[in-house]
A protein has these predicted regions:
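Short beta-strand-to-coil "C-cap" segments at the C-terminal boundary of structured domains/repeats
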Residues: 148-151
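Conserved acetyl-CoA-binding loop-helix of GNAT-fold acetyltransferases
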Residues: 74-87, 113
Length: 151
């Protein structure tokens, strides 16, 4: 595997095609891009991953979006990007990293492997916040799990 390069970029350069891999709503993405820290991962000069962290306070950051180029999924890039972002969060003196994800799917195990724990449920989040149904593996997402990693 080629050496990966991690880079912070401004919101206007965020790769929308990749962000849409993790969040199917352009409107939702635009609600959290401004004021967020955006990190990309490059392989051979090509952007293959992206992550968006939104500060909620001096000690709490929310992982709003993390995505890897579909042809590169399963190669460990997402795990390395998440570990990089966790390290960057600690460097910023954050005390916790929080996120929301669906109640099923590979994403839940992905986060739990890195130490995130379920701390709550936002009932009907996907029904109330998305114009179109969010479907994964033929099942509609309705509720959002809230996860937390104590740094």
């Amino acid at each position: 595997m080629p050496k990966l390069q991690f880079k912070s970029i401004p919101a206007e350069l965020a790769p929308m095609d990749l962000l849409l891999e993790a969040d199917p709503s352009t409107e939702q993405i635009h609600t959290y891009l401004d004021g967020s820290d955006i990190y990309t991962v490059l392989s051979d000069g090509q952007t293959v991953g992206v992550c968006v962290l939104k500060p909620h306070s001096e000690t709490t950051l929310e992982l709003m979006n993390i995505a890897v180029e579909p042809t590169q999924q399963g190669s460990g890039i997402g795990r390395q990007l998440l570990q990089y972002v966790i390290s960057e969060s600690r460097n910023k003196q954050a005390k916790e990293l929080v996120l929301g994800t669906g109640t099923f799917g590979y994403q839940l195990a992905f986060y739990q492997r890195e130490g995130f724990r379920v701390v709550g449920i936002d009932k009907d989040f996907f029904l109330d916040n998305y114009d179109e149904p969010v479907i994964e593996n033929g099942i509609q997402h309705k509720d959002m799990l809230r996860l937390q990693l104590i740094l």
